[in-house]
Structure formats: structure tokens, C-alpha cells
Curated annotation (Swiss-Prot):
Gene3D superfamilies (UniProt xref): Aldolase class I
Enzyme Commission numbers on file: 2.2.1.2
Summary of subunit composition and partner proteins: Homodimer.
SUPFAM superfamilies the record matches: Aldolase (SSF51569)
Assigned protein family: Belongs to the transaldolase family. Type 1 subfamily.
Alphabetic keyword roster: Cytoplasm, Pentose shunt, Schiff base, Transferase
Enzyme class: transferase
Organism lineage: Bacteria, Pseudomonadati, Pseudomonadota, Gammaproteobacteria, Enterobacterales
Enzymatic reactions: D-sedoheptulose 7-phosphate + D-glyceraldehyde 3-phosphate = D-erythrose 4-phosphate + beta-D-fructose 6-phosphate
Protein name as annotated: Transaldolase A
Superkingdom, taxonomy of origin: Bacteria
Keyword Ligase part of the UniProt annotation: no
Amino acid sequence: MNELDGIKQFTTVVADSGDIESIRHYHPQDATTNPSLLLKAAGLSQYEHLIDDAIAWGKKNGKTQEQQVVAACDKLAVNFGAEILKIVPGRVSTEVDARLSFDKEKSIEKARHLVDLYQQQGVEKSRILIKLASTWEGIRAAEELEKEGINCNLTLLFSFAQARACAEAGVFLISPFVGRIYDWYQARKPMDPYVVEEDPGVKSVRNIYDYYKQHHYETIVMGASFRRTEQILALTGCDRLTIAPNLLKELQEKVSPVVRKLIPPSQTFPRPAPMSEAEFRWEHNQDAMAVEKLSEGIRLFAVDQRKLEDLLAAKL
């Protein structure tokens, strides 16, 4: 059995890609997209029809050019998501504009709009996850959306404080970023030789997984942002893992036994009182890596969102 099939015995495998053809190849349960992945996919000629449709929609649904571009961007994200859902049996994650990461109300508004666009294409909201950055405002937006039956995927998650606040808000799923945590520590104190058990990104997800299971939180833990297959194999047993096509390929090509590494702890504990905003901000601020990586992640997604807008504006 290849490693990818081995992992699938214990973990739901999700494709981290906007490239519909590569998703088709690996038979994942779900797929996740983000502005960077959409920008990459939008540059491929086989998806031109999805872009043309989004442009036509933008022209029809915006008075100013700025409004048309925003409308086209939203439609493009949904077009890709709807195509992906023809292939995967589960859900697709679609991201709210990263520039709204500190605006709870506008994040809620954008999420509802994306769900509405999906429903106009005949996609039920039970097949959509709305991706929001794990800021205090993003978590509060998700808390409200969950009450409306709109499930959320809280992304750019780097600190334990973020993970705890998400669980306490009752969000559907979190995406702790293994690779970006690893990058930060590797740049400061390179691990040589590499020992996966000591990988700070792997340890972070393991801690969150154990904490959630010990306190009976139902929020799904989906490890994300991997740099190497060792990280993925070390988290086999995690609820879900979202994996880029290049790493899915490596796992599919290697035949070796896969052992479950994450197992729910037998000991359980009562849940603590929910964190206040002040506690959350303080705890998160104590983690220099998380502060830096959350800020950087929001900025990078915003840059790619703007590039996507420029690409569409040129076609309007």
C-alpha cells in the first residue's frame, strides 16, 4: 500500500489546491483554496472559461469598476469551488478577503454573500467551509456564522491561544499551519539533522489535537501547510490533513507501512472558562512566532488578492 492510502486509513485527506485537474488525480475527500492558490490556477489556460464567467458576472453586478472587480473576484472563487465540488465528495473551503481580517461585521457579510453565490449555483451550504483568519475578529465572526449554519475553517492558526479561542467559539474546523511554524524556527535555529518528533509545527498540532480531545471539543483539527512528507506521516490520525499536490504525489509514489501517530488521549478534563478578549490578545502576543506569522500570512494573502483583482481588472 502506498503512503497516501495508508494515511487515508486514519485521517481524512484534503487537497490544498485550486488546480482542479490535480485534485481529480488524488481522490481527496475535501479541498481547500485560498487567494494564492486561486491566483496560481487563474494563470492556467484551461480555466479561462471560469474567469470569463466571473468577468461577465462582475460587469453585470457592479456600477463602478471597483465594484465590478470585487464582484468578479467573489464569483471566481465560487466558480472554482463549484467545479471542485463536482470532483470531491465532501466540502470545499473558500476564503474571505484577508483585508477584512480585523472587521467582524464585514467578514460576516462577505461570508453570507459567498454562500449565497454558491447557492445560486445549486451548491448547498453543507458543502462549503468559509475560511477566515484566526484573529479575534475572525473567530467572533465565525461564532455568529456557525449559529446561522454556515460552517467555518479558521486559518492562519499559529498559537495555542488561537486554537483555544476557536474551540470555545464552537467553530467547525481549524487549520494549524505546520510548515510555516517550522519555517520560522528553522530560520532562527536550523534543525540539523531533521528530527520530525522535534519539529515545532508537528508538536503544535499534536498539542492542539490532544487538548481538543481531552476537553471534548468537537472542532475538527486539520493540519495544513506542510513542507515535507515526514511532517504529514507524523500527524497520521489527525482528524484531517490538507496537503498540496506535490506532497500528495510523493506520498502516492512511496510504498511503506503507515502507523497512526495521533490517538485521542484516554484521560479527559473539564473545560476551562472561555478566554476573554484581553486574555486571548495577551496569550497570543506572548508567542513571537505566532504574532509574526499571523501578520505576515494576512499580508501575503492580501497581496495575492490584489494581484487577482488586477488580473481581473485588466479583462473588464
